[in-house]
């Protein structure tokens, strides 16, 4: 969403943090992984609370509609970006975890290819952690994001 906003309205976006996402296309096992994750989340008390906090009392309907929309995108191989990435001028941080089991297995390679396409990108991959990276290690993610926003190197 943030990448598309920056592509459409760069005047409104100073930086983009793209955490734990598949990249330009949804990976081959996306539909199966999404269905499993969403069904598991519906049974998990913490996830149910999170969804309700984010979406309101009708969270389950919202999650089901979002799930179906993503499945349709995957089946139809719908492009995920509204414009070519080459047109993105906004500084972008591609961040993720090498242990993320929700995203494509070649996430780092996809991030490198996207970084090659954009004019102002950085990549940071955590060695450990799940999905999304920002929840796996919030303090380290906050440091990386702050360094990126301040134009510092990402160590």
Task: Please give the residue ranges for each predicted region.
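Short, conserved loop/helix-junction motifs that constitute active-site signature segments
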Residues: 85-89, 116-119
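Short beta-strand/loop motif that positions the catalytic acidic residue
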Residues: 88, 94-96
